[in-house]
Amino acid sequence: MCGAIVLLLLVGTSPAPVEGLRCRTGEGPSADDVKRIVRTCMNKITNAGTMGEWGQRDRNGEEQQMMRDYGRSHRRRKRQYYGGQTSGSSSSGSAGEHSYNGRASPQYGEAGQGGNGTRSGGNSSSSSSSTIERDRACLMQCFFEEMKATNADGFPEKHKVLHVITKDIREHELREFYVDSIQECFHMLGLDNRLKDKCDYSMRFVTCLSDRFETNCDDWESVTSAMF
């Protein structure tokens, strides 16, 4: 599998493709390589003391559980990040895509944690969910680091990501699709000057790529089913 397929498998999407390309390739890291990188990243986050509930799980199956759990919340995150506005002004272009119920989307780890911790019922559950969301976002950022595709500050870097993801793609049309998708997603994220966190940025980038794959890859469902 090529780099983009690996990243999107970690997101755990369940797409409903409309038409288009055969995006699955036989190149790139194997499933064992993916699991090794995921374990490495989970260990890093655990050792940093930020794994929250993930640190309590059975290590034998946690990487697959992470992928499956992540798919359940993917649709909700897409509504929040890429079309969650419900009121207020929404200018054309990307502004509406980056709104969160009419406000700036929160950084991972901030949602549901109000300034003094006095949010109404469900605050504890919301805080726990937010911690797990944060951990998963940082797992994705670590994945970019392990693929040598980040800049000095740990953010995914466009030219490095382009190289890592497209270097093994030989089919011209498919390669163009990957290049266009990566460039478009970096462009969209560049329009949001609120993105100052490398974990949040990494997950937003992968979510953007996932949207492109859902729309354009008519074999994406077979890719996810093959993984699980």
From Swiss-Prot:
> Keywords on this record?
Disulfide bond, Olfaction, Secreted, Sensory transduction, Signal, Transport
Q: What residue spans carry the Low complexity bias annotation?
A: 83-99, 121-131
- Residue ranges for the region (Disordered) are 50-131
Which spans does this entry mark as compositional bias, Basic and acidic residues?
Answer: 55-72
The record's section on Pfam families has: PBP_GOBP (PF01395)
- Some GO term, biological process aspect, for this entry: which one? sensory perception of smell
Annotated InterPro entries: Odorant-binding_protein, PBP/GOBP, PBP_GOBP_sf
Positions of disulphide bridges: C138-C199, C185-C208
Signal peptide (from-to): 1-20
Entry GO MF terms: odorant binding
How is this protein annotated for GO cellular component?
extracellular region
Q: Where in the cell is it found?
A: Secreted
| Compositionally biased region (Gly residues) | 111-120
Q: Which family does it belong to?
A: Belongs to the PBP/GOBP family.
Q: What does this protein do?
A: Present in the aqueous fluid surrounding olfactory sensory dendrites and are thought to aid in the capture and transport of hydrophobic odorants into and through this fluid.
What name does the UniProt record give this protein?
A: General odorant-binding protein 71
Q: Which organism is it from?
A: Anopheles gambiae (African malaria mosquito)
**Taxonomic lineage per UniProt?**
Eukaryota, Metazoa, Ecdysozoa, Arthropoda, Hexapoda
